[in-house]
Amino acid sequence: MKKLIGLDVVKKIPIVDISPLDRDNMVFDSPPYTVRDLSEISTQLIRVPTQEGFIGQMVNAMKYFFSRGDSSFSDHFSSMSESNNFPFKGFVLTGPPGSGKTEAVVEAGRRLYSELAMEGVEVRLLHISTADINRGRVGEMEQRLRSVFNEAKSEVRSTMRTILLFDDIDTLLMSRDDKRSEEWSVSLNATFFHEVDRLKTSDTMICATTNKKEMLDDAVKSRLSVKEAPAPSFEEMKIVAKSALPLRGANGLTQEELLELAAERIQKNRDAGEPDSFRLARKSAIEVLMKEVVGWE
């Protein structure tokens, strides 16, 4: 929403009437998702105990629903394993920007890919761009959203599991109690809930992220378990900061001396009100790099 001469100007999105036949045959210039390669060994994740524990819990939860072995969801709820009536559909990870939510989901997917491969099961992750969904007209936006779920269902088989990663889901699904809610957002909400309710958790799981938990619609929280991404400790932020500093030091300063300067920056930024996060650690290290190594004040 923008302010202009004291007036509220709300973006109006044109509404188009799309028939069911047109919806089924609609083709987009590009899909609103990217299929992430979970087989890659390399990762940009800096391993610290707090996040490692969080990722481990996520992997265990996903494996419980996706596995077909003993003590799995299918074992405990054999009569419901092929049903879409089970109320749990996935997670919403909350936390400040830069708290590692998206990276944690991708890393959990990578580890699950390796673990379930031993059961002959393939795991894939569709990384959904909410911006690509929102850029259409009303009618088109709903169909873009449906295309995500259609893709997930197109590969449903006994040896395939799908993770749907919705980044910043609050930008896609606005709470119906929010005064800024428009007809297009209400329609998107309805489409999302309808599609989610048709998912079988043993085949497809949603992992969403948000920096604004208070903006989530209650219906989202009733379907997706809300989990807080734990903030890194001060020492863990120093570990992350160290990875952004020259290994051999520079300009007469060792890496450890640069790290101490980065630690001071971290504390200064914390005192200014910035929440503890991996982003804060990297930002503080880059500030030191630019000043002490590059020479740009």
What are these regions (language model features)?
Residues 1-6, 14, 34, 249-297:
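Conserved AAA+ ATPase small/helical "lid" subdomain
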Residues 36-89:
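Pre-Walker A (pre-P-loop) alpha-helix and adjacent loop at the N terminus of AAA/AAA+ ATPase modules
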Residues 82-83, 87-126, 151-155:
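Walker A/P-loop
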Residues 122-157:
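Short glycine-rich substrate-engagement loop in P-loop NTPases that contacts/grips substrate
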Residues 130-142, 172-186:
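Flexible beta-alpha connector loops of hexameric P-loop NTPases
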Residues 149-156, 185-203:
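Substrate-engagement module of ASCE P-loop NTPases
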Residues 212-225:
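Short regulatory helix/loop adjacent to the ATP-binding pocket of P-loop NTPases
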Residues 225-244:
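Conserved AAA+ ATPase "SRH/arginine-finger" region at the nucleotide-binding site
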